[in-house]
UniProtKB/Swiss-Prot annotation:
GO cellular component: a single term: cytosol
Lineage: Bacteria, Bacillati, Actinomycetota, Actinomycetes, Mycobacteriales
Name recorded for this polypeptide: Lysylphosphatidylglycerol biosynthesis bifunctional protein LysX
Catalytic activity: tRNA(Lys) + L-lysine + ATP = L-lysyl-tRNA(Lys) + AMP + diphosphate; L-lysyl-tRNA(Lys) + a 1,2-diacyl-sn-glycero-3-phospho-(1'-sn-glycerol) = a 1,2-diacyl-sn-glycero-3-phospho-1'-(3'-O-L-lysyl)-sn-glycerol + tRNA(Lys)
Bilayer-crossing regions: 93-113, 135-155, 159-179, 189-209, 227-247, 281-301
Major subcellular site: membrane
Biased composition (Low complexity): 65-85
Residue ranges of the region described as Phosphatidylglycerol lysyltransferase: 1-676
Amino acid sequence: MRRAGRSRQFSSVEEAFSTSAARPGPRGRRSGRENTAKFVPATLSASTSFSRIEGISSRSVTLASPGSRSGSGPRSGPRLGPRNRSTSRYRWVPAAAGWTVGVIATVSLLGSVSPLIRYLIKVPREFINDYLFNFPDTSIAWSFVLALLAAALTARKRIAWLLLLGNMILAAALNVADIAAGDNTAAEIFGENLGFAVHIVAIVLLVLAYREFWAKVRKGALVKAAAVLVAGDVVGILVSWGLVELFPGTLARQDRLPYVVNRVVGFALADPDLFTGRPHVFLNAIFGLFGALALIMATIVLFQSQRAENALTGEDESAIRGLLELYGKNDSLGYFATRRDKSVVFAQSGRAAITYRVEIGVCLASGDPIGDPRAWPQAVDAWLGLCQTYGWAPGVMGASTQGARTYREAGLNALELGDEAILRTSEFKLSGPDMRGVRQAVTRARRAGLTVRIRRHRDISPEAMADTIARADAWRDTQTERGFSMALGRLGDPADGDCLLVEAIDRDGSVVAMLSLVPWGTTGVSLDLMRRSPSSPNGTIELMVSELALNAESLGITRISLNFAMFRSAFEQGAQLGAGPVARLWRGLLLFFSRWWQLETLYRSNMKYQPDWVPRYACYEDARLIPRVGVASVIAEGFLVLPFSRRDKVHTGHHPAVPARLAQSGLLHHDGSAPDVSGLRPERTDAEEARSRLPEQVRVRLAKLKVLQRNGVDAYPVGCPPSHTVAQALDADDQQDITVAGRILRIRDFGGVLFAQLRDWSGEMQVLLDNSRLERGRTADFTAAIDLGDLVEVSGQMGFSKKGTRSLIVTDWRMIGKCLRPLPNKWKGLTDPEARVRTRYVDLAVNPESRELIAARSEVLRSVRQTLFAKGFIEVETPILQQIHGGATARPFVTHINTYDMDLFLRIAPELYLKRLCVGGVERVFELGRAFRNEGVDFSHNPEFTLLEAYQAHADYRVWIDGCRELIQNAAQAAHGEQTVLRPGADGRLQPVDISGIWAVKTVHDAVSEALGEQVDPGTSLSTLRKLSDAARIPYRAHWDAGAVVLELYEHLVEDRTEEPTFYVDFPTSVSPLTRPHRSRPGVAERWDLVAWGVELATAYSELTDPVEQRRRLQEQSLLAAGGDPEAMELDEDFLQAMEYAMPPTGGLGMGVDRLVMLITGRSIRETLPFPLAKPH
């Protein structure tokens, strides 16, 4: 009777453990969420809901955290998520219990199907069955029950702990009862005492390890599953009864039905000795199989009821759509979160959520969290807490780099699955050799008469959409729709009106192929469905993709997410020349599996469009779980279809997961449509969060601004010209009505009287506010509203303060601009040079010297123009974007024009275009404009600078010696009122230096000779020049000719040491490719450089007008450019062709205007430019 008693301990075990390997049910899910994420009430409001943050992108194979293993095993760093590994000394108990029961289940199954194994294990099996644990000789059903129990124990299910503990307590009680009854043999007494000791140890361990079994079980449809179990058992009993009647063996007639019931329903736990006789041996396995089949059918029904929990409610979907509208611009897979066969868990703040499915005990998250990236860690914590609550293994499919990093920070590992193909529509084109295959396919499709129609789903009639769905089903090459993380799985839903349908139509007007794409933010689409008729011509898909990309601008689309290519890097690296054996073997293995799963086909079908590849990752907790996560992914994606499974396209969820206040706000819709978030743009939240980090003074000023706005004061009104400038007001009569406007720099408040210092561009003055003179308001109103730096407009009459200071006696005032940031120290101003460059606007507001520099620069530019206009020159504008960089030897900036798909250069000089004008008959021409050179930045160089180039027909370079001197002297006169420039004196202060009169003129070779103390002329040999350079420690390059060496000596020994303005004339011909040779001195060209105080200011040529010689020289330069010299000029055939029409003898001048301003003001280029280039912060 001992065994019979034990046989009743697990009479309903199939109900208890059927959830251990299945999807949890609705009540369990809800309670889990309540325990793991006590949601902060979050309505869709500007203050609590949403904000936007940009994403990041990188390419790496794994994202294991520092100090951790990328594959498996415990990590050395702390686990940041809620699934912290237990630190209890009893943490091993769940696994040990699961392994023990699992071994018994495995041996029981083997014994049930193999007589040999059953014979071999007979003695230990009977001992275990009699004294330790139920272990019948044959029972497939009992093996199935033990397998469920083992899985539940390993998953730390609380109900499994309870049932195992109950079994141990009952078994111990039976042993105690048998010991107390006595009349046992010595062997039985030993077995009973040993069993009792084992049970006591097991009970103590289970009780002590109670907290290690924390996982709950989601509730399923127990009644429905029980009905299926009863029906299956009844059928199994009846069929088994029939079999035992046919093959009774020695089994007595009265024991046949009880024996069958024991084997089918009772798991053969009753002692066989209770029955008279035995049936044929093979029947025991069949009886157990019937019981197992009934259990399996009931479990499947229970699983199916729990899978219904893998579904959204309407409120869930509505909240997800709201998050996507506010934050979904960076996630190409975000819209697939609205797939309705998923569950969702929200972050505590309600600003982020994760959608997931539960398959075979794996909680599989679908890509990145949805919502504010700053709330992603909260969503991941809530999701991991849910996994811990129910004992699920966490897994992620299709995470982006940013998402994978978030999961990694929560304790998961990441592996690169493959890459997503992204088309940038602004860069897409059918031209070029790389697009030849696509171009040919598109041409074939067009020749076949195909056209493309593109529509939003909302623009399609219900009848047409029904036809579209029918075509999609007919052209599907699988029995069911696939997809989980990268597919929507539905068509024709009214909530998907923003989706895009691309159709290929033949000559008869029939649709032969279609693409359906879901929204990706507001400017992108992501491929969801691709179908084509078997009769469609070759190139149909290429035509649809190309037409979509080429017409994207009219649709407001800038990016298209195409298919996902698994293991793309493996295909690419394995095919490279010199790939290693491992890479080639891995690629070969993938090619083998591509026969069934189209791995390579997906890669090549996307690669031909030349997309950007964006990696996607799978995340897992431990390497041992990778196979399990992989199987769960295969099930979720639809590649492995479980019995009775379905893909819900309607809302079948039972309990909304959205926070309570959000659900009660009235913003969410039961049909899943997006809430109205038009007034809740994330920029508001960003502004508020940024404001909380602002300095105190800024927050105070913002508060004042709000007060003014509430009081109806427009702090930024429409402009009205003041009657006077400050300078004019100071000279005006006392009785004259005056209105001035400017910035408040200082305020002195004496109660009823207030003094303020006001500055405009013309100067600075004191304004006086007296309560007795104000027409409206009081001085206190001015103090309450105005801060230093505010722009105000004041009206009144001029007068004097009691101390005799000339002041404007104010009768009325108004604010015209609220300054939200405080000005620098009123006495020192901006002292940091870098700060002055970056915030030039503040520097101008507080620093009179900066204003003087701006004014001086303006006067210099005006003077240069007026001097040239007075000589009969005309000003022109030539292209800044040029196809060939020429006109000077310098490294250019390169850009690209998409329309013509070619590189362009920002001009380094306008020379070649101005000479075209000279050919056309423009005899005196100049251009004053910007030029760009990709070179160093220092006190005298800026990548962007102002350049003057002027050309005068029938002149030479000596004419421009006087012309250049006149330009500079006139500019100095305009800036200072006299022909002087400012230079630092011995004390460091700027002192005026007279530059009037005639300036020195020297040849280059004479100047170099003076510097070396050795005679150098155009005929000096290269070897001699090299020796002189070595002696002077001037470096040179081996391929330089004599002219280049002389130029290097000149730059180091002459130019850098020049003080007074000096013209250095007659440069070597080889370093002057656009200059005519000297008329009387061989080896030199008619060119001069003007140098003053170590800086080259200008250069002038007698221009080379011989087109044959010009071509020869430019060809030499082009050879240097082809050899890798980035500064050498390229061959400009258009320019040479223009020169062949004959250009008159011309003298040309080039002058750096920025350096001219530097010379006149004595400042660096960064000080004289309003906005010089500065390093990024």
